[in-house]
A protein has these predicted regions:
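A cross-family phosphate/adenosyl-ligand binding-site feature
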Residues: 1-118, 124-213, 217-397
């Protein structure tokens, strides 16, 4: 996602500096050009050689390193950078930047940067809550630094409270959100549904399906990365929810119907990737249903058809995309669903096809519109999400 992007990773003198090494590695896996700048105090916690080995670039520490190229190094790097992040950021570095002090390689470079700048504080809770530190954070925010709030947890000083550097995965998501994609969906409101529904028959048992929500979550995440204002209405899943997205949890098909239809009128794009139950128990027992005999009959009734309702109430200019999971006659069944429910596009896949089932990290999809069908090869669900959004934006014009 970060191919061709240059990321400055500033590392300061904190016990959390070890996390920066993993972040550097994760950025390299995203194909970023990672330029690490350490303060002198940071070198007491991590050896610069570690970062040089992980990034393939020289780790900068000394502003007056004589082994420099002709360009004024901190200015040249600042001009080249697509994003700068200091993680961990000590109270000392934040105070310097808040007041415009430039006495080392990191501060001089950051003050020259015009790219997005992120600060991830890590320190003792009392230090973080100190009014002077908080004032400095406000100054940094007013000067277009984005502050990544620390987490609450057990700290190196044996205290417990705010001041813990977020996980590297969280820091990476902040970076990806800023520079991974062009913001071609900025200003659009997008509603995505994902995951299964659960239809209770008593306090213990329920009817559900094998959906994990991976495809819908990938779509919601890609919409967010491309600048959209995203609402994700999701059934219960075990996978991590995408960040920077408005999460609306539901359990039953009725709850999903209410949450989706209530929000639908204000959406520009609706992508319904959830696996919603078609039927639910006609009655729900207040007590656990006991075994009685060798057989049991469960009376079912139809659930609300969310996609049909959305198609019937689609506002002018709104784009409606559905999903179709089939085991046979995939194209015929999906075309019929597209027409019957007044969709702009339907994404079809076959459960029996290798790599396209529930719970996989890959998918094999066919995008069907009233005018054409586009079949794609096996790819990751993240890649498939990008292809789906590309097609939606093309069709919207």
């Amino acid at each position: 996602m970060l191919k061709g992007k240059t990321v400055i990773l500033g590392v300061t003198g904190s016990i959390a500096a070890y996390k920066a090494a993993n972040l550097a590695s994760m950025l390299k896996k995203q194909h970023a050009d990672v330029q690490v700048i350490m303060t002198q105090n940071a070198t007491q916690f991590m050896n610069p050689i570690t970062f040089e080995s992980l990034t393939g670039n020289k780790c900068l520490v000394d502003t007056f390193d004589r082994n420099f190229q002709f360009q004024v190094e901190h200015v040249a790097l600042a001009k080249r950078a697509d994003l700068a992040i200091i993680a961990p950021a000590t109270a000392n570095i934040m105070a310097k930047l808040a007041h415009g002090l430039a006495d080392d390689m990191l501060t001089t470079t950051l003050l020259a940067c015009r790219c997005p700048r992120l600060i991830a504080p890590a320190m003792n809770t009392r230090m973080f809550e100190n009014s002077i530190v908080q004032d400095n954070l406000k100054k940094l925010t007013l000067n277009d630094y984005q502050v990544i709030q620390p987490e609450v947890g057990f700290l190196a000083c044996r205290d417990e409270g705010a001041g813990k550097l977020p996980k590297e995965e969280v820091l990476l998501d902040y970076i990806l959100k800023e520079i991974a994609f062009e913001k071609d969906m900025k200003g659009l409101k997008v509603l995505v549904t994902a995951g299964p529904t659960m239809e209770a028959m008593d306090p213990v048992r329920y009817i559900t399906n094998h959906s994990t929500g991976k495809m819908g979550y990938a779509i919601a995440r890609n919409c967010m990365l491309r600048g959209a204002d995203v609402t994700l209405v999701t059934g219960q899943t075990s996978i991590e929810k995408p960040r920077f997205v408005n999460i609306v949890p539901i359990e039953s098909a009725r709850e999903m119907f209410e949450e989706v239809t209530g929000r639908a009128p204000e959406q520009d794009i609706i992508i319904k990737a959830a696996a919603v139950a078609d039927y639910r128990p006609q009655t729900v027992s207040d007590e656990k249903v006991k075994k009685s005999g060798d057989h049991m009959t469960l009376e079912l009734e139809k659930t609300d058809d969310i996609l049909k309702y959305l198609g019937e109430h689609k506002k002018e200019g709104q784009f409606l995309c559905g999903f179709s999971m089939e085991t046979e006659h995939m194209l015929e069944n999906s075309r019929a669903k597209l027409k019957k429910k007044n969709l702009d596009m339907i994404v079809a896949n076959n459960l029996k096809q290798a790599g396209a089932g529930f719970g996989t990290d890959t998918n094999v999809i066919t995008m069907i519109t009233p005018e054409e069908e586009i079949s794609l090869d096996l790819m990751s669900k993240e890649e498939a999400a990008g292809k789906i959004l590309d097609e939606i934006l093309k069709l919207r014009g």
